[in-house]
């Protein structure tokens, strides 16, 4: 019996709570589906991450759970992770031609509005979290949204991390701290990444 209790205690140290929920932004008449990964212990030191998925052609209403391997890992490390479902089935498809800084901007702006609304609502729902060290992470098109958010609302975030975003120019700024993880299969568009100059 004692052995069983110690195994349960050990497992509970690494456990987390996962759930799906939705927010409703009345000003845009928009539902924002979320996947939330909450660490076992939540307190004033618990940092918050909002994760933005890559584009999937509006085919998957659970794109915000596609990266669960990463969001779970971050939650196990003590972060409170909120993964936003950016594209809904009836949203316009992402532009695949033209000047992407223009043709994709409506999609990115919708993503920025989703992120901003989620921050505002969760600050009310979870005021005990550490919102001073807030982090944004995004992959591909979600990375473009992350960089646009960092450009428009730098005062709200501490760090912005993109994984293989290709289109949105990274702001040239000290704050927030910006990071990009790059694969070797696709290059970013000219001017997107900072140079040494």
Task: Locate predicted features.
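Structural recognition of the beta-strand scaffold that forms the well-ordered cores
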Residues: 48-51, 80-84, 135-137, 159-163, ...
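Flexible, glycine-rich phosphate/dinucleotide-binding loops
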Residues: 43, 58, 90, 143, ...
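Short, solvent-exposed loop/turn and secondary-structure capping segments
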Residues: 60-63, 93-95, 148-149, 172-173, ...
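Serine-hydrolase catalytic machinery in alpha/beta-hydrolase-like enzymes
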Residues: 30-129
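Glycine-rich His-Gly loop
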Residues: 51-57, 140, 183-185
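N-terminal cap/lid segment of alpha/beta-hydrolase-fold proteins
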Residues: 2-44
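The feature captures the conserved acid-bearing segment of alpha/beta-hydrolase catalytic domains
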Residues: 158-197
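Primarily recognizes the serine-hydrolase "nucleophile elbow" in alpha/beta-hydrolase
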Residues: 117-174
